[in-house]
Amino acid sequence: LGDVYKRQDYDYMKSIYPDTAKRVLPYMEEECDRMEYDGSMMYDEYPDRLQLRLMCRRIYDKAEKEEENPGAWLMDLIEVMTYQELCRRRVEHREIRKKIY
């Protein structure tokens, strides 16, 4: 039941994101989904900074097309959103692994 509340809370908070963040969100979630597999660097104890930057760059390359003045601010937003999402997924991954083992 706690997991349901966590998910509802998270979904609500995403629903009140500013417009720019809402436009970035699908690209960020798609990239995180793509990286979510056993052995992925996103589950490493200390994910490689270069790989994280490359991941964010792939998101930026898609998201910048929708912005009038993309730039460093957009990359900063993408990095913050992506790292937050990775933290959430890493916690979920650990909790699932605890239940299995």
Go through the PLM ranges and name each one.
Residues 69-99:
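Amphipathic alpha-helical binding modules
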Residues 42, 46, 96, 100-101:
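Residue-level signal for alpha-helical context at structural boundaries
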Residues 1-5:
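Short, small-residue-biased leader/transition segments that mark boundaries at the very start
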Residues 6-69:
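Membrane-proximal topogenic or attachment-prone low-complexity segments at protein termini
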